A protein has these predicted regions:
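A conserved short coil-to-beta-strand element within the FAD-binding core of flavoproteins
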Residues: 54-65
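C-terminal, flexible cofactor-proximal segment of oxidoreductases
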Residues: 151-244
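Cofactor-binding loop segments of dinucleotide-utilizing enzymes, especially the Rossmann-like FAD-
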Residues: 25, 123, 179
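FAD-site-proximal beta/loop scaffold in flavoenzymes
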Residues: 65, 73-145, 152
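Rossmann-like dinucleotide-binding cores of NAD(P)H-dependent redox enzymes
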Residues: 1-56
Length: 244
């Protein structure tokens, strides 16, 4: 955007005055992936001109300055906050069944601990074990696999069959860091770069329902790739200018 979109469509803006900072509270990027993926993401972002600060927690923002835990201030009018999720409190769920972020503790069958006949799957649920003391990663595959296993257990329960405890099958993780740049963690192989980016595109294209929708998305991607332009834009009007 800084290199192609702003100089082309917003001549009144000086793109050289735009700085992009990424402030990460942890000591590495992509903590849910391998060290290789985190290091690759850091290199790609740095190559793109993003100034990355690790171990930096933002504690406040007043509309003009973002303040960190150490007291350092960053002047900015545009702040994107990506600090994770927190579940809403649900009446009837005891506090003893809640973990950090209001995640609900469940057993290996996804039943809420301390509450009978109530189940939770996906991001809202946390299933602890010796191998996973902090629960499963909060990704779509966990939710899908838990939902399928729970549905099968409901059928088994109706037929008086043995219930099956949930066991997560890690199919791998991917993250894209812009054009031609991505990182992929597979159970037996970790790689990055253009091949990883193509794999990310293929997997996400495959997940789209309908042949027509797949073709439309693929065409939009091709246009964006070859023209360095984005077909989707959000126009944000200045409220003060509208009143004037």
């Amino acid at each position: 955007m800084k290199k192609y979109v702003i100089p082309k469509d917003f001549h009144e803006l000086d793109s050289t005055e735009i700085d992009i900072w990424l402030l990460q509270g942890g000591d590495r990027l992509l903590p849910g992936m391998s060290d290789e993926a985190g290091e690759g993401a850091l290199k790609y972002l740095t190559d793109l001109g993003v100034q990355v600060r690790l171990g930096t927690r933002v504690t406040g923002y007043d509309g003009k300055f973002a303040t960190t835990k150490s007291g350092e201030k960053f002047r900015t009018r545009k702040l994107i906050w990506a600090a994770g999720i927190k579940g809403n409190s649900i009446e009837g769920i005891p506090e003893s069944s809640l973990e950090r972020g209001n995640r609900i503790c469940v057993d290996s069958y996804n039943q809420v601990i301390g509450v009978e006949h109530v189940y939770a799957v996906g991001d809202i649920a946390i299933m602890k074990s010796e191998e996973l003391p902090y629960g499963h990663p909060q990704v779509a595959q966990v939710a899908l696999q838990q939902a399928i296993n729970l549905a099968n257990n409901f059928n088994n329960q109706l037929k008086n069959r043995t219930l099956r405890a949930f066991k997560y099958k890690d199919l791998g993780s991917m993250a894209t860091i812009g054009r031609n740049r991505a990182v992929v963690d597979l159970p037996s192989w970790k790689f990055k770069g253009f091949l990883a980016w193509m794999m990310w595109l293929a997997v996400h294209l495959f997940q789209i329902l309908g042949v027509r929708n797949k073709l439309v998305v693929m065409l939009n991607w091709m246009v964006s790739y070859f023209t360095y332009d984005q077909s989707l834009r959000v126009i944000i009007r200045n409220e003060n200018n509208e009143k004037e």
